[in-house]
Amino acid sequence: MVHFTAEEKAAVTSLWSKMNVEETGGEALGRLLVVYPWTQRFFDSFGNLSSPSAILGNPKVKAHGKKVLTSFGDAIKNMDNLKITFAKLSELHCDKLHVDPENFKLLGNVMVIILATHFGKEFTPEVQAAWQKLVSAVAIALAHKYH
C-alpha cells in the first residue's frame, strides 16, 4: 500500500479541484491513442481513429476519457485505499477487456503531461512528484487482478 502525506494529498486535490474532467479526460485518452497508437486496438468500436485530428475530435474518445477521469476522481477520494477502489475495474480490464496493464502506466504519464500543460507554473516539482506517485499507485491498483 502506498502512503500519501498530507502535503501530497493537498497538492493532488488542489489541482484536481480546478480540473475540467470532461475536457481533460478526452484530451488524456486522445493523447494516449495518438502517442501510443497500439493502444487503439482496445477501442475498435470507437469508429474513426485514423489520424490525430480524428482521434481528438472523436466523441466516443471524449466520452470515454471523461469516464476514465471520473474514476480517477475516485482515486483522489480514496488515496489510502486504491486497491479496493479499483478492484472491479481491475477485474474488468483483466478478465473481460484483456488490456495490457502497461497501458495504465502510459495513461498515467499522459495525465502528468496534461497537468503540466494546463497548470504551468502551478505544476511545481513537488506537485509533479505527488501526481506521479498517485498515477503510479493507480496503475498498480488497476493491474492488481492480473495473474
From Swiss-Prot:
Provide the alphabetized UniProt keywords: Heme, Iron, Metal-binding, Oxygen transport, Phosphoprotein, Transport
What Gene Ontology terms describe what this protein does at the molecular function level? heme binding; hemoglobin alpha binding; metal ion binding; oxygen binding; oxygen carrier activity
Question: Which Gene Ontology cellular component annotation is one that this UniProt entry carries?
Answer: haptoglobin-hemoglobin complex
Q: Where is the Globin domain?
A: 3-147
Under the heading Gene3D superfamilies, the entry gives: Globins (1.10.490.10)
Which positions does the record annotate as the modified residue Phosphoserine? Answer: 14, 51
Summarize where heme b binds, as residue positions. Answer: 64, 93
Listed under GO biological process in this entry are:
cellular oxidant detoxification; hydrogen peroxide catabolic process
The record describes its quaternary structure and partners as: Heterotetramer of two alpha chains and two epsilon chains in early embryonic hemoglobin Gower-2; two zeta chains and two epsilon chains in early embryonic hemoglobin Gower-1.
PANTHER family recorded: HEMOGLOBIN FAMILY MEMBER, HEMOGLOBIN SUBUNIT EPSILON
Please report the name of this protein according to its UniProt entry. Answer: Hemoglobin subunit epsilon
The beginning of the lineage is: Eukaryota, Metazoa, Chordata, Craniata, Vertebrata
